[in-house]
């Protein structure tokens, strides 16, 4: 069938958008859907149709009912000096955003930390989680169920690990509420973010549990104790994805000459804004100035699951005055990133990861994803430092007026 024939059928409602993939090659199907939509809504979509993506490469992998692609400006910051266990050296970091002044802000923070010797970064924990919820008729059955899980842990581990070459079950943590039990499974997932990997593994385990402990009714493979795409205490306390810490000691001359401030003032603002202000506002774990800005921009650029910004931007900014220098650290308990799979395979996202030398599987497995996590945490620290400094000297509004609105200031 020709494209124009498919377009006509779409406009008449004789076929649905998803059925086009059965009639045309993937790229032709994308064109047909877009042309039909243009006729249906009466709007031309030439920009959406202009893309470098080969849709035959992402069919049944990244999106459905595709009509084109959205483009977001991509900027670069750096070089930032990172002294991590996996990221060692100077790195340029790609950031995709439509927020004027963000990239310039982060870049000034990077200049300050690099002139002060760079950022030290460490991945303290690395595990992706999934937590199915089991329903019981009575709490009488729960102690035996927990004992069953403990006694069959190795068998469960073998079942889970058999579903993937890279997924390795590390632990199972039970949580009980009434006649409900959540089992929070934690996995190593190599260089993948690992959400699909652990879901497939846990589904197999749940089949085994229901077959061998019939009173356990697995209602859902995800019971929200995982906790995916939500700001939760369980992620802040136990971690999800990478738990990363980064620190730097900013020299007094750098604070004065680059940031136009002083250590005591930046520290005071951090305590009153990021800690007292956040506590008074009632946030669970967002004790920071703008982690979300930096993490989101890097997530978009590198093909991460952007919805996971909810938990990936949770974290804490800590400062101390040391003489006239400023100690600053950031802690991200649930940074969920990968360098293989998902959106990382898209051509522009692949190139963005390659800028930092982290595309694909690392050697050993998992090292590239941890390297990326250390780079992100170091960039987040730089963004926090600069924003706190900008607040201390009343530069925030001027920066956004100049770079966000193109106003003369």
UniProtKB/Swiss-Prot annotation:
pH-dependence annotation: Optimum pH is 5.5.
Active site, UniProt feature: 99 (charge relay system), 305 (charge relay system), 400 (proton donor)
Temperature dependence: Optimum temperature is 85 degrees Celsius. Stable at 90 degrees Celsius.
Keywords, ordered alphabetically: Isoprene biosynthesis, NADP, Oxidoreductase
EC number annotated for this UniProt entry: 1.1.1.34
Family classification: Belongs to the HMG-CoA reductase family.
Protein known as: 3-hydroxy-3-methylglutaryl-coenzyme A reductase
Protein's organism: Saccharolobus solfataricus (strain ATCC 35092 / DSM 1617 / JCM 11322 / P2)
